Amino acid sequence: MSSRSRFDQAFKYARVIPFNDTDKFILFSDCHRGDNSGADDFANNRNTYFHALQQYYKNGFTYCELGDGDELWENLHFSTLYESHQNVYELMRKFYLENRLHLVWGNHDMIYKNPSQVKKNLHSHFDRRTGEERPLFPGIEVHEALILKHEQTGQELFLCHGHQADWMNYVGWRFNRFMVRVLWRPLQGAGISDPTSPAKNYLELIKVERRTKKWIVERNNQFTITGHTHRPRFPEPGDIAYFNDGSCVHPRSITGLEIENGFISLIKWQIATTDDGVLKIVRVLLEGPQKLIDYKTN
């Protein structure tokens, strides 16, 4: 199956979410929540991510996580991730209970393609304090893709992880997972990058972006948002409508895409220092806001 066929299939079976200009969405991906060890790339940005997500929760945003939220290549069990980042999952639970959480699977959490794995890992968790199973995201479904469809204009925003353009991380993901577990994770502490990841392999990153853009053009410039490469992208109207929300494992910040009042913006959250030496977490606008309708082609 070609990358085109994989994208076509994801688009065909995507969950459609109607929205209008009063709705607000925050899109993050590639959190890679791990076990809080030295190999956990998320741990350095956990406080930044948690604060940002709290602000979005308080301000009525819906959270769409576009894959690789859970690092299930390096870690065997979701329970390890929950115990390491319990405050994060409990905040996500609040979103879910208010119907404001949508999850997409990526290559590092591709086991969620299997509904039985979703039920086993996400519907409930074992509470060590009570010795009982406790609901976490009861009944949740994890999708390959989402389509945000505007109720007035009919515009469709296609959201997926983006590894559909990466054969080795879509078809060959089990082999890559094996290599990460037995080889690259132990070497990560020595500063050796995983060459199977497009986020750490520039040539592969370019190939993934090229295949994605080719599919977008073939679909009449279909508005598309992905993650996977960890490289934020925000096109001008009239260019190829390929957006990328970046990742939550940048060295000193997290990036994402906001949709609000019919506009889209690329943002980052980072720790900044005030003039009197106080550290605080701040939101920085990187690109936009740009009207969604400016990208409409059909």
Enumerate the language-model features and the residues they cover.
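Extended recognition/assembly regions associated with phosphoester-bond processing machinery
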Residues: M1-E65, G69-N298
